[in-house]
């Protein structure tokens, strides 16, 4: 696991009404488990790329055993990384939230939401963590960014400043909390995570 900084100055994002502005108003400390390599790595079992693709379960529909293997792999990763993040944060506890998928909550099959379910299960098993995995719920479709380039992003808009507030319900339970926000894949300049972080800060 590595630590880095999500920088406000690199979070320039389009505004819905035109122009650009920073999606994130302050720098944020972040962590990642491993680098994402493009190409055909998603086809290679046990890679981070394969794990992410399996949990999305949208390009290829995976059998239950493959999904179970992904759940077990992610569980192992989280049980190592989460306590280390808590230690490095210096906090007594962290509320764990999850970046929602791009489409509205009720448009996914249960087996497309195993990433969040796995994070929830591990969070409930570890000391020092509060389950906030359902604090951010998507109610309006946005474009699926990892499919948008191929023209298969579906209904909804690509990221703009304020898209999280416009398309998600955010629980008041996040107010005043130290939050660990988890996403399966962070892509600099896309600004999905930056906008969601700012929405939580504004709450």
Which ranges hold each PLM region?
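Short amphipathic alpha-helical segments and helix-helix/interface helices
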Residues: 83, 119-123, 197-198
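A short, conserved beta-to-alpha structural element at the edge of catalytic cores
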Residues: 194-203
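Short connector loops at secondary-structure junctions
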Residues: 126-149
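Active-site-facing substrate-recognition patch
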Residues: 2-95, 103-105, 109, 141-175
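Charged helix-capping and loop-helix junction motifs
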Residues: 111-117
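DG-centered beta-turn motif at the end of beta-strands
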Residues: 182-186
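Hydrophobic "anchor" residues on beta-strands that sit immediately upstream
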Residues: 178-180
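Short acidic, Gly/Ser-rich segments with clustered Asp/Glu that frequently serve as metal-coordination loops
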Residues: 187-192
